[in-house]
């Protein structure tokens, strides 16, 4: 490997400075494998090239603190792209060989975050997010119908719901901040068939014979 550097010579009345602008690392055949440059204002970038001199990894920073990195396949298609912004936001995306988005994740400056996973047809299959007071996740079938929905909150409350292929709720479970918890199972006619509840004092209500959910005595 060989190193080639380009410099700019700048003279002023009190001292001399040398500012490196571009670096190139070449292989034994004289092909560029790594290139990098910096600007006096803080911008910088670096790229790694394969033996065919195609860029495979690139990264850069801007003067305001923003930065990005990208991984490319042998055909020059971006497969992974990540970036951070000056205000603290950040994101990452993953693409398949057909350049279709498969995974996307992002965080905001306030700590909120989200993630999406898509199938090969570009349909959303999993979505997850964190909010200021909790978090949630959803799972979708191949027809784009929500099948599972779960949520948690910072106060200890949480719930999960399961839906059938007709998007009718079949199972619902929840816990509350005071320690109460319950679960219900519905038949295809939306009637409650099983309902159980627990209370903070240790009371447990088991399923009843009718279609109505139990009530605390």
Residue map of PLM features:
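Single-pass membrane-anchoring alpha-helices
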Residues: 1-12
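N-terminal segments that cap or nucleate solenoid repeat domains
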Residues: 13-40, 45, 209-217
